[in-house]
Amino acid sequence: MSENSNHHCIIVGIAGASASGKSLIASTIYNELRAKVGDHQIGVITEDSYYKDQSHLTMEERVKTNYDHPNALDHRLLSEHLEQLMRGEAVNIPTYSYTEHTRTSDVEVMTPKKVIILEGILLLTDPRLRNLMHASVFMDTPLDICLLRRAKRDVEERGRSMESVFEQYQKTVRPMFMQFIDPSKQHADIIVPRGGKNRIAIDVLKAHISRLLKA
C-alpha cells in the first residue's frame, strides 16, 4: 500500500464502477471507525460533489454531458481541497444536483479530519489524487450487477426514467468504464470482489487505517 508522508490526515480512496458498492463500503468503514477516532475526526467525500458547474449551459446541453468521462469532474479543485484538509484547513465542498445537472449554491463545510474516505468512479485515473492517498481500493463488481443497482437507484432516488438509464449505460457508462475506470484498477492497493459487503476487505482496510493512525 502507498505510504504518504503527511499523516496529519489519512486519505483512503475507494474507486470502481457506478453502483459497485463504493458508498456501502465507505459508510461501513466510516461507521465502524467513528468510535475509534471520534465522530468529528472522520469524514466521507464523494467525487460526485466535484462535477463541474454547468449553470452556464441550457438543460438540453447539460443532459448531453458525458458524466463518466474524467473531463466532467473538477479533480483540480478536489485535490486542492484534500491538500487544504491535510494542512489543517477547512474547505467548502460543492453540492451537485442530479436533477438540475449542475452545482447548487449550497456548500458543505468540512473541517480537518484524522481520516477522510474518498469515494468515486474515476479517482484512480488522476495521479494528483492517487499521490494524496495513503491507501486505494477498487471495487471489482461485475458490470451486470452494477447496471441493475444503478437502474434501481437512479429511478428511485434521482428521478430518472428506466429508458434514459439504459440509454446512458449503452452510450457512455459501459464505454467509459472500459476506457478509463477498469484500467485504473492497476493503481489500487486492494481489489475487492463481491461488492461492499466483503467483510475481509473491510477489516483489512480498518486495520491499515489504524496502523497509519499510530504512525
Curated annotation (Swiss-Prot):
Residue pairs linked by disulfide bridges in the UniProt entry? none
Principal localization reads cytoplasm
Single annotated GO MF? ATP binding
Q: Where is the signal peptide?
A: none
Report the EC number(s), separated by commas if there are several.
2.7.1.48
NCBIfam families recorded for this chain? Answer: PRK05480.1 (NF004018), udk (TIGR00235)
Question: What HAMAP family does the database record attribute to this sequence?
Answer: Uridine_kinase (MF_00551)
Q: Under which name does UniProt file this protein?
A: Uridine kinase
Q: Which organism is it from?
A: Aliivibrio salmonicida (strain LFI1238) (Vibrio salmonicida (strain LFI1238))
Taxonomic lineage from the root = Bacteria, Pseudomonadati, Pseudomonadota, Gammaproteobacteria, Vibrionales
